[in-house]
């Protein structure tokens, strides 16, 4: 479940400034693009760039989140390159892409660009957690399964799913089999 986990330490901040310098060689253009002159938050030199955590500028916060997702993609690409040097031709590379979470998997994971990160994988892998018992609808399995299948335009592996005995999570008799068939019906191997 590799994602950015809110990484924002000093090294990441410095890397973000370098990323912005490359994207906006003219600091005046950067200030205009992000509305920093208007909000009296102008950055006069790159060396004076403030810590971006807690910024009131949503455009800047969104660009930093985009950069954090880029770091995840670079990290996974680096890992996949290492593994590629050691794996046999019949072996594959995967990673556990998870989804946003509110009591269960509900949609896109905001801390990783799964489509970009999956490029270095051989097979998409995911975890899909969904309600059980009378709350099981199949919506989470279908929605997250569709995302997973589209990462590589192929079938995917379910690396984790709902199979524990937590209160109200324990499936009804036969429901675990139903869930497995639902994953298969949505493109899981």
Ranges and model annotations:
Residues 93-95, 124-126, 155-160, 189:
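Hydrophobic faces of well-ordered beta-strands that scaffold small-molecule active sites
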Residues 49-63, 144-176:
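Active-site clefts of carbohydrate-active enzymes
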Residues 175, 179-189:
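Helix-enriched interaction subdomains in cytosolic or periplasmic regions
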């Amino acid at each position: 479940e590799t994602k950015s986990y809110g990484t924002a330490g000093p090294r990441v901040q410095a890397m973000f400034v370098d990323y912005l310098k490359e994207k906006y060689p003219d600091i005046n253009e950067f200030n205009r693009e992000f509305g920093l002159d208007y909000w009296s938050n102008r950055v006069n030199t790159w060396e004076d760039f403030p810590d971006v955590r807690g910024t009131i500028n949503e455009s800047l916060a969104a660009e930093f989140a985009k950069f954090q997702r880029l770091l995840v993609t670079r990290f996974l690409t680096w890992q996949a390159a290492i593994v590629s040097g050691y794996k046999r031709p019949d072996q594959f590379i995967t990673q556990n892409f998870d989804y946003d979470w509110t009591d269960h998997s509900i949609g896109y994971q905001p801390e990783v660009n799964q489509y970009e990160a999956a490029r270095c994988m051989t097979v998409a892998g995911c975890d899909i957690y969904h309600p059980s018992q009378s709350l099981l609808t199949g919506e989470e399995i279908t929605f997250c399964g569709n995302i997973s299948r589209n990462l590589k335009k192929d079938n995917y592996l379910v690396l984790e799913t709902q199979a524990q005995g937590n209160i109200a999570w324990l499936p009804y008799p036969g429901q675990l089999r139903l869930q497995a068939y639902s994953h298969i019906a949505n493109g899981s191997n």
